[in-house]
Regions:
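Glycine-rich beta-strand-turn "strand-cap" elements at beta-sheet edges
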Residues: 1-2, 33-53, 59, 78-105
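Short glycine-/aliphatic-rich beta-strand segments at the starts of folded cytosolic domains
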Residues: 3-9
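Short, contiguous strand/loop micro-motifs
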Residues: 6, 14-15
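Hydrophobic pocket/interface hotspot
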Residues: 7, 19, 31, 54, ...
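Helix N-cap motif at beta-to-alpha junctions
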Residues: 13, 57-62
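Short, flexible helix/strand-to-coil boundary loops that buttress conserved ligand/catalytic motifs
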Residues: 23, 68, 81
Length: 105
């Protein structure tokens, strides 16, 4: 059964444009070298603001761990992460399973 990982990064107020530029120039190029497990990235428009939200889909927990182990061993991604961390206030991860009804991502 597929596992979904919802990651929510709360950005320091006034730093969203810096985070977006960092993702465009360093983050996404580094991530795109790895298997495509990303469903989508989102930013908030109403409700909680200053957040980058991303949804990932993995075959199972072993697939998830293998993916992140590969990403975290990538020097280009780790350079991006080093620059991203000071711009964030909080990081939250949720692991979810698809409901047994309705559409699946």
């Amino acid at each position: 059964m597929a596992i979904y990982e919802l990651r929510t990064y709360t950005v320091t107020v006034g730093k969203m444009n810096d985070v977006i530029e960092l993702y465009k120039t360093l983050g996404w190029p580094a991530l795109s070298k790895h298997p495509n497990k990303l469903c989508s990235y989102f930013t908030g428009d109403i409700g909680a603001l200053n957040q980058i939200i991303h949804l990932w889909k993995f075959d199972d927990e072993a697939d998830r761990r293998a993916f992140w182990n590969g990403v975290f061993s990538d020097p280009e991604f780790m350079n991006f992460a080093k620059q991203l961390r000071p711009l964030l206030q909080n990081q939250e991860n949720k692991l979810m399973l698809g409901a047994p009804w309705g559409p699946q991502v």
